[in-house]
Design a protein with these regions (language model features):
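Pre-NBD coupling/linker segments of ABC/ABC-like ATPases
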Residues: 1-14, 20-23, 27, 33-45, ...
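ABC ATPase nucleotide-binding domain signature region
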Residues: 97-103, 107, 113-182, 256-267, ...
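Conserved ABC ATPase "signature" region
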Residues: 181-194, 414-429
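Conserved ABC ATPase signature
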Residues: 195-199, 203, 433-437, 441
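Hydrophobic anchor residue at the start of the ABC signature
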Residues: 209, 237, 447, 475
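Walker B catalytic motif
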Residues: 224-225, 462-463, 470
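Helix N-cap at the start of a conserved alpha-helix in ABC-type nucleotide-binding domains
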Residues: 231-232, 469-470
Length: 572
């Protein structure tokens, strides 16, 4: 089976291209003009049945808009949905489990949202026939004998009510008008009186979740519910979903592995080639599913979908060799909010995590270190070079390559810079306009731009936001390696505890009252900081015996009771 994908957003025919793909195609030269041709909108198109997979058009396309992929012929029987000619397609389909929580795991652009749309009835399986899609009866017949058939039968008879929390926020108006009940007490009272336009990302996420939970539905779907939420609220939402929807069918898409593991009963892995095609795996228990994803190999299907196994490592110990920077105790007042910090020092190779809920001064802290905010005693003059990636990233008009050149005009000649942009996947974005980047692509550009700068201290505010699991792990590895090799240091604000655990040798734990006061502890070993945080929220964690990833214990389980009794809330 052959797949030809042309990304119309990147194909610049006919304005800036004379169809070089057609000019170089051997089949076109032989007289089969319809192998590569222009569609009515002027964009290039490929007839897959005539293509011989020579790959010449892929190599010669100046805009990197073409992909030719060969799959086993038997995959044609599993084709479930295709958007249009030469577009993304998905094989197999996500299968909801009655009165259980199903988690979907996979890279961005691999078909998770497409499958959610299929399950919610927003789009319907067409089995590749996008011009003449099948009827409901034909769809149900096609899935005869499969676990998904009864669900789709009920869905198309309108006997299944679905509540969907979308990935993108769709809020407009007063919060109290959007959330009539808030049955589970998710939203703070002060937020209820505000307009949705004034909400932070975390507040908007909580509103969307509350709206979804207020529905009386049969199936609840949550697309990336943990985005923008702090650790405390991630735990709160996971617990609410588990308890409030214990007798409902639930589907969750999430990139935070700790939360996904804690929240779900079953996992389906989506793999393939991002933006080209996605394949849905069989159903697995959550622990097995996540460990299988980490291993990159599906034993039941005998498929290796990644050529390496993800290694979950504990952050290496710090050397405390040479002090790079020290800061005194300081205070920052912004309106009614006040931040009071302890003094601290960073050593060569240090990566220090910042842990705490939203609204208690974490971003204020690193902005003060970066010299963006004045303290009560004036701006801090630390006498060092600082590179800073803010939480909110501005998407300026212009090419990605120009944005990188603004950081360092000579970056194409520097091996270190090229390695950074290659490992983060920014190379394939060079000809894109920054304004057209997705949230994840913009995040990777911002991280690359920060790491390319010559600095003594690197400050990262939520670097994993909008990144999929593999991009998060690549970012962890990259930051860790650069700080270790260059003997520089970094401070990382992060809500993904696996990120903190894997990268940060030390951490600072923030406490206080959101929007009013923030207090910092002294810098301490990360294991101690996580232990203290977990104690404050009455949650225990352990390491998985196979993958070594952190896992949350179920409340009142044997391990949970034993760890709480011993005071070891994070069992190493």
């Amino acid at each position: 089976m052959r797949i030809a994908v042309i990304k119309e957003s990147e194909c610049e025919a006919p304005e800036n291209c004379d169809y070089i793909c057609a000019e170089v195609c051997p089949r076109v030269r032989e007289g089969f003009k319809e192998t590569v041709y222009a569609k009515p909108n002027g964009k290039a198109a490929i007839t897959e049945s005539l293509c011989i997979s020579c790959g010449i058009c892929v190599k010669r396309c100046p805009f990197d808009a073409i992909r030719i992929i060969n799959l086993p012929d038997e995959m044609a029987r599993e084709l479930t949905f295709q958007y249009s000619l030469n577009s993304f397609r998905t094989f197999n389909i996500v299968t909801p489990v009655s009165k259980k929580i199903l988690g979907l795991i996979g890279r961005n652009g691999i078909g998770k949202t497409t499958n959610i749309r299929l399950i919610s009835g927003d789009i319907k399986p067409n089995f590749g026939d996008f011009k003449n899609p099948p009827s409901n009866e034909e769809i149900i017949k096609k899935f005869r004998g499969k676990d998904i058939q009864p669900y789709l039968t009920s869905l198309y008879l309108n006997s299944v009510k679905i509540a969907l929390k979308p990935q993108e926020f769709r809020l407009s108006g007063k919060v109290k008008d959007l959330v009539k009940l808030d049955k589970y007490g998710i939203i703070n009272k002060n937020v209820m009186e505000r307009s949705s336009e004034t909400l932070s990302g975390g507040e908007a996420q909580m509103v969307e979740i509350a709206r979804t939970l207020d529905n009386d539905a049969d199936v609840y779907i949550f697309d990336e519910p943990m985005n923008y939420l702090d650790i405390k609220n991630r735990l709160k939402i996971a617990q609410k979903i588990k308890t409030a929807l214990s007798d409902k069918t639930v589907i969750v898409v999430e990139h935070d592995l700790i939360m996904l593991d804690y929240l779900t009963d079953f996992i389906q892995i989506l793999y393939g080639s991002d933006a080209n095609y996605g394949i849905v795996s069989h159903l697995m228990p959550s622990r097995n599913g996540i460990n299988t994803y980490i291993a990159g190999y599906l034993p039941t299907e005998n498929v290796r979908f990644r050529d390496y196994e993800i290694r979950i490592k504990k952050a290496p110990s710090s050397s405390n060799e040479k002090v790079i920077v020290s800061w005194p105790e300081f205070e920052v007042d912004i309106g009614e909010f006040s931040l009071k910090t302890s003094s601290g020092s960073l050593y060569g190779g240090d990566i220090v995590g910042v842990i705490g809920e939203n609204g208690i001064g974490k971003s204020t802290f690193i902005r003060a270190l970066a010299g963006e905010l004045e303290t009560k005693s004036g701006r801090l003059d630390l006498g060092i070079k600082i590179a800073y990636k803010p939480q909110i990233i501005e998407a300026k008009d212009g090419l990605v390559s120009d944005a990188l050149a603004d950081v360092d005009p000579n970056y194409p000649k520097k091996q270190e810079s090229l390695e950074i942009i290659n490992k983060l996947g920014v190379t394939k974005l060079l000809n894109k306009n920054v304004k057209n980047l997705s949230g994840g692509e913009l995040q990777k550009l911002a991280i690359a731009s920060t790491l390319m700068r010559e600095a003594d201290v690197y400050l990262f505010d939520e670097p994993s936001a909008n990144l999929d699991i593999e991009d998060r792990l690549e970012t962890m590895s990259l930051i860790s390696n650069i700080m270790s090799l260059k003997r520089k240091c970094a401070i990382v604000i992060e809500h993904d505890l696996m990120f903190i655990d894997s990268v940060c040798q030390k951490s600072i734990l923030f406490s206080g009252e959101s929007g009013k006061i923030g207090l910092t502890d002294t810098i301490m070993p990360t294991s101690k900081a996580i232990n203290n945080f977990l104690k404050s929220v009455d949650i225990t964690m352990r390491r998985d015996k196979d993958s070594k990833r952190p896992r949350i214990n179920q409340n009142n389980s044997r391990l949970d009771v034993e760890q709480k009794a011993s005071g070891q809330f994070f069992a190493e």
